[in-house]
Amino acid sequence: MLSIMRRAGQTLAVAESCTGGLIAQRITSVPGCSEYFKLGVVPYSKDAKKAVLKISPQVLRKFGAVSEQVAIAMAQRVRRIVDADWGIAVTGIAGPSGATKAKPVGLVYLAVAGPDGVICRRHFFKGTRHNIRKKAAEAALDLLIRDLR
């Protein structure tokens, strides 16, 4: 990713909920990431999403923290906070608890906000909590890389 971001002269900020910092960890494990990586935050709770990212309480109440609307808002807000070219956001239910019939364990929303708008994808990952979080982090980075190309 470093070569893609460097070539494009672009910057990145990340807001992670269910992945708990895994995306930022993967990015910062590569020397030279400071050339493009501006911010990584983990607003895990609804209160943190409101306080850190200024996600509307009405949006959280209407759609829930695990929703397309919240993922999109997170990606847009984290991008704006540090004036990054790109913002990635992840929100989901890694389990084993916290699920409902409508929102099962493994449901994850990934959003990428960039210069040309926002894309959001819904995924259903299977496996342990660790596996769901790992798959979500990988999918989020893949989504960004596809958008960069």
PLM regions: where:
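Short alpha-helical segments enriched in small residues
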Residues: 1-149
